[in-house]
């Protein structure tokens, strides 16, 4: 279900404030955030945002193709450990 157009996209205030300050200063430092639900806006292009996956911060470089998506879409929270099949030689 999409968000109402009159409300606009959700971006955490602290993240938006950091982006606007760094745009004004001309810096491109890595920004750490826990806000996986924030929408990527056009003024975030060119930044590297380290998004928390529950264990560590994973860096995501923001390009123009990512605009409109959520930050959490690009950082998986679950690691898949494959199901190890029993070796047939050891069964004999």
Curated annotation (Swiss-Prot):
<dbReference type="InterPro" id="IPR023575">
    <property type="entry name" value="Ribosomal_uS19_SF"/>
</dbReference>
<dbReference type="GO" id="GO:0000028">
    <property type="term" value="P:ribosomal small subunit assembly"/>
</dbReference>
<dbReference type="InterPro" id="IPR005732">
    <property type="entry name" value="Ribosomal_uS19_bac-type"/>
</dbReference>
<dbReference type="GO" id="GO:0003735">
    <property type="term" value="F:structural constituent of ribosome"/>
</dbReference>
<comment type="function">
    <text>Protein S19 forms a complex with S13 that binds strongly to the 16S ribosomal RNA.</text>
</comment>
<dbReference type="GO" id="GO:0005763">
    <property type="term" value="C:mitochondrial small ribosomal subunit"/>
</dbReference>
<keyword id="KW-0699">rRNA-binding</keyword>
<dbReference type="Pfam" id="PF00203">
    <property type="entry name" value="Ribosomal_S19"/>
</dbReference>
<dbReference type="GO" id="GO:0006412">
    <property type="term" value="P:translation"/>
</dbReference>
<dbReference type="InterPro" id="IPR020934">
    <property type="entry name" value="Ribosomal_uS19_CS"/>
</dbReference>
<dbReference type="GO" id="GO:0009507">
    <property type="term" value="C:chloroplast"/>
</dbReference>
<keyword id="KW-0689">Ribosomal protein</keyword>
<keyword id="KW-0150">Chloroplast</keyword>
<comment type="similarity">
    <text>Belongs to the universal ribosomal protein uS19 family.</text>
</comment>
<keyword id="KW-0687">Ribonucleoprotein</keyword>
<dbReference type="InterPro" id="IPR002222">
    <property type="entry name" value="Ribosomal_uS19"/>
</dbReference>
<protein>
    <recommendedName>
        <fullName>Small ribosomal subunit protein uS19c</fullName>
    </recommendedName>
</protein>
<keyword id="KW-0694">RNA-binding</keyword>
<keyword id="KW-0934">Plastid</keyword>
<dbReference type="GO" id="GO:0019843">
    <property type="term" value="F:rRNA binding"/>
</dbReference>
